[in-house]
Structure formats: structure tokens, C-alpha cells
Regions:
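Register position in tetratricopeptide repeats
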Residues: 12-13, 46, 79-80, 109-116
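Canonical tetratricopeptide repeat
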Residues: 5, 39, 72, 106-109
Length: 118
């Protein structure tokens, strides 16, 4: 069975918990391991379970250090109110893809919040 593709199909129905279970099986079988870990983490973002997404993003990054992986990791840290780590990972994402306007906006928002904060 192609767990990764099945997980993608389930993800598209927004059944994120079932998709996570299938992505986990895909990752265990080394079936597009980085993509499986990344997509699992994105499912956790949809479920607003950012703390569960963070280690999955780190594991995916260890296998494939892509800009979008760092961007979503930074987003999770921002949602967990960890501004220093969010800024670090947004900057890393932007270093890998300096044409990403969303990343630039996120960095500017974080920097602005530092200037406003008491």
C-alpha cells in the first residue's frame, strides 16, 4: 500500500487525524520520509497542535532542509509565542528563498513586535 499517497488523499478530505496516522506509517516505511513528516506536521497545524508539529518539522528538516519546512516551523514557534525561535527560523527560511514575500512579512511583523513590546 502506498501510505503516503493514501495519506494525501485523506488530507484532502480534511480528516487530519487519519492522515497523520497514515503519514506516520509512510515515514516508518521510509516512503517519502521527509514529506511524510512535513505533511504530518502540517496536519497538526490545521488541528492547532503546534507543539506536536515542531519535532516533526525538525525531523523533516534533518532529512530535507527546504525553505517551506523552516517557514512552517517558524510559524509554529510564533503560535507558541516563542519569538526568538520564530525569528531565527523565518530568517533561515528567507535565506533559502529570499523571494518569499510571506516570509519577509513575517520577519517584519516579528521585528515590529519587538520594537512595540515593553
Amino acid at each position: 500500500m502506498d501510505y503516503f499517497q493514501k495519506a494525501n488523499d485523506i488530507y484532502n478530505t480534511k480528516d487530519y487525524n487519519r492522515a497523520i496516522a497514515l503519514y506516520k506509517k509512510a515515514a516508518e516505511m521510509k516512503d517519502n520520509e521527509a514529506g511524510s513528516l512535513y505533511n504530518s506536521a502540517v496536519c497538526f497545524i490545521h488541528l492547532k497542535e503546534y507543539e506536536k508539529a515542531i519535532p516533526l518539522f525538525h525531523n523533516a528538516i534533518n532529512l530535507r532542509p527546504e525553505s517551506k519546512y523552516f517557514f512552517n516551523l517558524a510559524y509554529c514557534y510564533a503560535m507558541c509565542l516563542n519569538k526568538p525561535k520564530a525569528l531565527y527560523y523565518f530568517n533561515t527560511a528567507w535565506t533559502l528563498n529570499n523571494e518569499d514575500e510571506d516570509c519577509e512579512k513575517a520577519i517584519n511583523l516579528l521585528l515590529k513586535s519587538y520594537r512595540i513590546a515593553p
